[in-house]
């Protein structure tokens, strides 16, 4: 019991977390020794669901989770071309895909798009917040809805990441 309370009282240490090897400035992760291994033959097709908007000037943590997934798996030996990711964005988070001076996510999104990560906006949320397709960061896709996007992704072999 004492041991458990000591563990609970400890603050997490993020010293082992670092970005890279794919995204040098974001997507920090830590190596894990002795865990279930990943193999160079593993393949991933994963959809991330993001509805929470970032604080002004900050990176969207949901978007960065997708970058973390790529960084940690490539660092563990999975080839980058074995990883297909889509970030389905709805709710206020669609505003993090509109370019602008105060958008702390824009540079990250643009770099992730260059690496083949898809960003898919819920058209229903975009309509609610007055965001048109031509107002989005170049390369971001607009679908009828987030529900539609997830259904279509699942039909092509994507799983949904619950984190």
Where would I find each of the regions flagged by the language model?
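N-terminal signal peptide c-region/cleavage motif recognized by signal peptidases
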Residues: 4-6
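A cross-taxonomic marker for long C-terminal extensions/tails that follow the last structured domain
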Residues: 10-27, 98-163
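Acidic, glycine/proline-rich low-complexity segments that act as flexible tails and inter-domain linkers
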Residues: 18, 23-25, 34-38, 75
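Acidic/histidine-rich, surface-exposed loop or edge segments in extracytoplasmic proteins
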Residues: 39-55, 89-90
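Envelope-exposed proteins and targeting segments
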Residues: 42-46, 81-85, 115
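Solvent-exposed, acidic/flexible segments
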Residues: 52-62, 80, 101-102, 143
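Histidine-anchored nucleotide/phosphate-binding helix
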Residues: 59-78
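Acidic helix-start/capping segments at beta-turn-to-alpha-helix junctions
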Residues: 80-97
